[in-house]
């Protein structure tokens, strides 16, 4: 049977399943952060505020998140071993991710925005490696794959939410057009 708990397993499985599903929320953080930039870079106010960046600079702004994610994913195992899985996730969101979001939201120049993208990527990389690790180590084996797969689903939900928020703010004639989508990431971090 599908998702049938083994009869010889002792204890309640539902607390671990709920915690694992909640941890999947980190995927929204990842997907939303990845998805916001595609809409933001086309917003008229953002283009004017950031001195009409050329294609090379746009490529840097978009891809620097992946550089941070790469570095974060490499460091995630070490951090998780030092701080523990749960605290590793919490610290990854509180420190590098929130710093990156703050820098992006406050930025009025390309270098600060690029630095913010890197630090947000660092936090996303740390989280994206630690959450599946945490889920895999805490969930019962009979449900583990489905719950870890929910993390991937949450990435897609995050991309969808980013598209909605970008669409809703794109025609604002002020910095709120790009700052609102960026600042909403604080809410995702707070929830996680």
Predicted regions and their residues:
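Transmembrane-helix signature of 12-pass secondary carriers
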Residues: 1-192
